[in-house]
């Protein structure tokens, strides 16, 4: 959530930054007008309360002296009625301010490229060279069926579209991947966490999914619970409402969890395969950092995600998302896109973001600065390290062989009991 004081004092800068994120200046102007009206009413309310206190003291004195206080009482009752009217107006204005400010996206960092959509994203670097196949490559969904390791038909029967069963070495490959990912992140100083897979609505508000993106989630009927769309939500909210010791920062968390997404706006997109599912495993990284260190921590987090792809030998590129393509809470985002041979393109496999104090303000996560003793909002960062199902897809396609088998990447073999290849039955 943005700082209302910043909007008030640096309106033109905030308006210009949010314009690049598709927010109309009229919206901010309306918010500013509401804020000005609210502040004026607060002044009136305080003046009337002071007047009421004086009148109350005068009435008490008149009664002690057995004087007639009828007029003073009538005057005080009118003042009290005026205060109530103003307070009701303030409640209504506060709600309007909340309705606007809670759906405003974060302001982009100055280094973020300006653009309308993914076509305006900027490639930063590439790693690895896509393999030159001398046979016709298969898509990962066909490989999965031919190898009897992915069962889409029964997934659809048991649950519905965009669900599947992992079987045999497919299940072991998935498990090997997330164990490998967690182990690599732990080496980099991340604390492993097993989170709840359901969170309450306050947690969804804290990380920015609510109220704007409710339709993208699975809520449990007649409860305050939501299935997590990413472990970012419980990990970030771990410290919601707390004040941390500045000497402890930065703090690194990692967790593997299922992620549940309705994919409300994705009808007709990626209807086959592991790219877009309602339920999938993902290893998440979350950081809590001091403001002056957060962008250095973003670079480190991105490198941690890249490390996984490099050790798996998967070609990828790093993209800096433009203002029009970033997520709601992000101030800056790097996407990692892995090479998918059957599609002859790169597809997103990780997204690493610095939200600055946007989530921390919503969730009230603060720290006490050891330098001056003041309590301040910290910065939160999050990143995929990696989306496990998409990594399975990338391995199946990049490591496929002409005979229909798939070679298991060397770094995963110790996690799979020494298996070196997945062969057709």
Swiss-Prot record:
Q: Is the keyword Protein biosynthesis assigned to this protein?
A: yes
Q: Name one GO biological process term.
A: selenocysteine biosynthetic process
What PANTHER family would the database entry show? SERINE--TRNA LIGASE, SERYL-TRNA SYNTHETASE
Give the subcellular location: Cytoplasm
What's the protein name?
Serine--tRNA ligase
Function, as annotated: Catalyzes the attachment of serine to tRNA(Ser). Is also able to aminoacylate tRNA(Sec) with serine, to form the misacylated tRNA L-seryl-tRNA(Sec), which will be further converted into selenocysteinyl-tRNA(Sec).
Q: Per its UniProt record, what InterPro entries does this chain match?
A: aa-tRNA-synt_IIb (IPR002314), aa-tRNA-synth_II (IPR006195), aa-tRNA-synth_II/BPL/LPL (IPR045864), Ser-tRNA-ligase_type_1 (IPR002317), Ser-tRNA-synth_1_N (IPR015866), SerRS_1_N_sf (IPR042103), SerRS_core (IPR033729), tRNA-bd_arm (IPR010978)
- GO function terms (MF aspect): ATP binding; catalytic activity, acting on a protein; serine-tRNA ligase activity; transferase activity
Which UniProt keywords are listed?
Answer: Aminoacyl-tRNA synthetase, ATP-binding, Cytoplasm, Ligase, Nucleotide-binding, Protein biosynthesis
- GO cellular component assignments: cytoplasm
**Pathway note:** Aminoacyl-tRNA biosynthesis; selenocysteinyl-tRNA(Sec) biosynthesis; L-seryl-tRNA(Sec) from L-serine and tRNA(Sec): step 1/1
Which positions does UniProt annotate for ATP binding?
261-263, 348-351
Task: Give the HAMAP family listed for this entry.
Answer: Ser_tRNA_synth_type1 (MF_00176)
Ligand binding (L-serine): 230-232, 284, 384
Q: Which Pfam families match?
A: Seryl_tRNA_N (PF02403), tRNA-synt_2b (PF00587)
Which top EC class is named for this enzyme in its record? Answer: ligase
Principal subcellular localization: cytoplasm
Q: How does it assemble?
A: Homodimer. The tRNA molecule binds across the dimer.
User: What is the similarity comment for this entry?
Assistant: Belongs to the class-II aminoacyl-tRNA synthetase family. Type-1 seryl-tRNA synthetase subfamily.
Name the EC number(s). 6.1.1.11
């Amino acid at each position: 959530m943005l700082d209302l004081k910043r909007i008030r004092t640096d309106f033109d800068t905030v308006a210009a930054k949010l314009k690049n994120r598709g927010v109309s200046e009229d919206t901010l102007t309306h918010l500013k007008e509401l804020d000005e009206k609210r502040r004026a009413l607060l002044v009136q309310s305080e003046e009337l309360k002071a007047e009421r206190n004086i009148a109350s003291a005068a009435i008490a004195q008149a009664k002690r002296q057995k004087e007639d206080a009828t007029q003073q009482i009538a005057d005080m009752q009118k003042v009290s009625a005026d205060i109530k009217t103003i307070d009701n107006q303030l409640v209504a204005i506060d709600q309007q301010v909340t309705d606007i400010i809670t759906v405003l996206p974060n302001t982009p960092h100055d280094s973020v490229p300006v653009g309308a959509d993914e076509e305006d994203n900027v490639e930063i670097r590439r790693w690895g060279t896509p393999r030159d196949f001398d046979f016709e490559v298969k898509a990962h969904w066909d490989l999965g069926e031919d190898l009897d390791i992915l069962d889409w038909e029964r997934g659809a029967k048991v649950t519905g579209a965009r669900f599947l069963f992992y079987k045999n070495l497919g299940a072991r490959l998935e498990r090997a991947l997330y164990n490998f990912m967690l182990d690599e992140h732990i080496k980099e100083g991340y604390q492993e966490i097993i989170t709840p897979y359901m969170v309450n609505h306050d947690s969804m508000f804290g990380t920015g999914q609510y109220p704007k993106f409710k339709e993208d989630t699975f809520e449990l009927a007649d409860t305050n619970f939501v299935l997590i769309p990413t472990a970012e939500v419980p990990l970030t909210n771990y410290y919601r409402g707390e004040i941390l010791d500045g000497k402890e920062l930065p703090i690194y968390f990692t967790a593997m969890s299922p992620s549940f997404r309705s994919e409300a706006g994705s009808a007709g997109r990626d209807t086959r395969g592991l790219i877009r599912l309602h339920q999938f495993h993902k290893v998440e990284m979350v950081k809590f950092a001091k403001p002056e260190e957060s962008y250095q921590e973003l670079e480190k987090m991105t490198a941690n995600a890249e490390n996984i792809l490099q050790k798996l030998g998967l070609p990828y590129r790093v993209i800096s998302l433009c203002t029009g393509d970033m997520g709601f809470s992000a101030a800056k985002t790097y996407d990692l896109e892995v090479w998918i041979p059957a599609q002859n393109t790169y597809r997103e496999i990780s997204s690493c973001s610095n939200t600055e104090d946007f989530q921390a303000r919503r969730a009230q996560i603060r720290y006490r600065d050891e330098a001056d003793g003041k309590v301040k909002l910290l910065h939160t960062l999050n990143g995929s390290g990696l989306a496990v199902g998409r990594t399975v897809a990338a391995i199946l396609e990049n490591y496929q062989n002409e005979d229909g088998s798939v070679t298991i990447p060397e770094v995963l073999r110790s996690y799979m009991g020494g298996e070196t290849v997945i062969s057709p039955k």
